[in-house]
Amino acid sequence: MEKLEKLNPLFYPKAVAVFGATDTPFKYGNLYMQAIIHRGYPKEHLYPINPNEKQAFGIKAYPRVQDVPEPIDLAIFTIPKKLVKQSLRDCVEAKVKFVSMFTSGFSESTSEREEGKKLEEELLEIIAQSNTRIVGPNGMGVYSFDGKISYPFMYHPPEDGPVSFISQSGGLTVELASMADFWCDIRFNKIVSFGNAINLESTDYLEYFAEDPKIKVINMYIEGVKNGPRFFKALKEAVKIKPVIVWKGGRTEAGSRATLSHTGSLAGSNKIWEVALKQAGAVQVYSMEELCDVTMAFLRIPPPKGLNTAILGAGGGRSVVSTDELESAGLIAPSFSPEIKEELSKIVPDVGTGISNPIDCSYFVYYDLDMYTKLIQLMDRDPKIDIILLQHEVMWGDRNEHLFKVIKEAREQTEKSFVVVLLPSAGPRKYTPELEAERLKILKQYLNEGILIYTSMHRASNAIYKMVKYYKFLELQEKPEEEVFAYSKLHKK
């Protein structure tokens, strides 16, 4: 609980001051005020700090933070770099708990790196003997659904979710919040964009979210860390409590150079990062899409007991490539048990079909939904199967709605991990924007019901495999060393 108490005022501030607040459109002091007010933060505890303004957004402005009538938990700097030092001194004098610095031009600046580093050191000297802590500089700051805090360009969904995002990039947090909500129905409870991290760093937020009962999955985008041993120690502890999904920036030589000019971070050796993340038990991803895919798996299905996956689809070629994609990702498509195979042979016609795994029933199965239901029930009964995966295409007429109802009921009746892959094929129809819109409508329908759904076998298989690997890692922490070695030899991915 110590970490929660330490950072709670940052995510649940009782009073907020915005340095540089103004009514002038398109200035960041204006945009931050807009975002915070739009998020619903109470105006009576929101204080514009600007000696050149009498008010902002109808709220009285103060020339100095020392002049406001209550203690400030969070100050947000949207001011020029030349004003930062004195403003920080004012915050220390006023006993402000946290200062979030959007201001840039520090060690990340290519043209002024040495000067920027020196300025960062001076900022640390200013807060050295105080309880004031810095988020940033060069970071967007904090989003907190319950704390009603936000920043410019941020998407504000009407509901929150059990996910947090720790990011060195501000722009990626804005992109992820919007994309994750639209495509995956993932929403965030808390986000922090911490930029150069001269004071508080990724490890502090990781420790906080590990203890936060509102957070079920932790997402991270990091380019580098100041204190590697401390970070990986915190990471090892966090993954014992909840999944931590890490997207590491700067993996290539060119990407590593880019991190230096983005946040002033040294990205470090990619191979060392890969090994260290694996040893810590983190789930490593390589894109925003993959981050969403894996997060969605953790939120929507119970932990699979193993890798064995039953596939129900249509088409011989599709069955072949689906199996290739599934096993290439690390999952397994085993043969069904003899008794289940016998039951399948009684149901599935023997022309143009197959009853191995995948089950290929050709397209007529979508017109015999009683058979479709029985096939799912048989897959569910097979003790060898851990995961049920159904793939289907956008259908004709009311077939989509009927199929959805059958799949929804089947999912409610199984305790196994249950996944749908929605393919784009138009069959005899020309693929048009209208057909893609229909596919999106179906996708959202499944998402709204809490069903795990992907748009390709590759994305589904990859996400689920990484989920299984995480839970296997947790299991192996309790097992003898020889069992751990045997597992690592079998699953080298």
Kindly label every feature range from the protein language model:
Residues 1-493:
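Catalytic-core regions of core metabolic enzymes
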